[in-house]
A protein has these predicted regions:
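N-terminal strand-loop-strand
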Residues: 1-56, 105
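Short, charged/polar surface micro-motifs in flexible loops or helix N-caps
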Residues: 14-17, 43-46, 62-63, 98-99, ...
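Generic C-terminal helix-cap and adjacent flexible tail
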Residues: 14-17, 166-172
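Residues that scaffold the ATP/ADP-binding catalytic core of kinase and kinase-like folds
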Residues: 48, 64, 152
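The catalytic Nudix box helix
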Residues: 55-91, 105, 145
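Active-site-adjacent beta-strand/loop module that shapes the phosphate/pyrophosphate-binding cleft
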Residues: 93-130, 142, 164, 171
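NUDIX/MutT-family hydrolases
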Residues: 117-159
C-alpha cells in the first residue's frame, strides 16, 4: 500500500491590473491571472533552494482518515492558521516519483494570513554531529502566478497545476 498524503491548493483569479476576483469570462486564454498558494519547504536541505523547492501544503494520513480532513489538518499545522472555509473540490490523486499518492483538494479563495507559523520536525544537523535541531516544515508561503509556480513547485506536483488549469478553464 503506498504512502498517502493529502493537501490543499488554494487559487485565486487576478485581473491584469492586479485586482483580485476577476470574472472567469474576462480571463485571458493563457490564465495569466491564475495564482496559487504554495509553501517553501523548511529545513537545511531546502534552505538555499528556490527552484522546485516549494510544495502544496500537505501531509500524510492513515487508513481510515478522510483525505479532506487530513488535508485541512495539515494545512493548519503548516500555515499556523486554519484553511479558509470553502467548498473544496477534489482535484485528483497524483502519484509522486517516490511512489507516494497525494490527494489534492482545491478551492478559490483569497487567503491572506498575517503570519506563517509552521509546526517543526527534529533533525540531526549537521549530520553525524549528535545535535538534534528543530526546523519548521514550512519556512515561507505565498501566492505565485501559475506560470511562476511551475518553476517553484517540486516537479512531481506539476500535474496538480495542469489539473487546476483544466478545472478553471472548464468551470463556468
Amino acid at each position: 500500500m503506498p504512502v498517502r498524503s493529502a493537501g490543499i491548493l488554494l487559487y485565486r483569479l487576478v485581473a491584469p491590473n492586479g485586482v483580485e476576483g476577476t470574472s472567469r469570462d474576462r480571463m485571458p486564454e493563457s490564465l495569466d491571472g491564475l495564482q496559487v498558494w504554495i509553501a517553501h519547504m523548511g529545513g537545511p536541505f531546502w534552505a538555499r533552494k528556490d527552484a522546485h523547492a516549494w510544495s502544496i501544503p500537505k501531509g500524510e494520513y492513515t487508513e481510515g482518515e478522510h483525505p479532506l480532513a487530513a488535508a485541512l489538518r495539515e494545512f493548519a499545522e503548516e500555515m499556523g492558521t486554519p484553511a479558509p472555509a470553502a467548498d473544496y473540490l477534489p482535484l485528483g490523486e497524483f502519484r509522486q516519483p517516490s511512489g507516494k499518492l497525494i490527494t489534492v483538494f482545491a478551492a478559490e479563495q483569497d487567503f491572506q494570513p498575517e503570519t506563517i507559523s509552521s509546526n517543526t520536525f527534529p533533525l540531526e544537523w549537521p549530520r553525524g554531529s549528535g545535535q538534534i535541531r528543530h526546523y519548521p516544515e514550512i519556512d515561507d508561503a505565498r501566492w505565485f502566478p501559475e506560470s511562476e509556480a511551475r518553476l517553484k513547485l517540486v516537479k512531481g506536483q506539476l500535474p496538480v497545476l495542469d489539473a487546476l488549469v483544466r478545472h478553471v478553464r472548464a468551470d463556468p
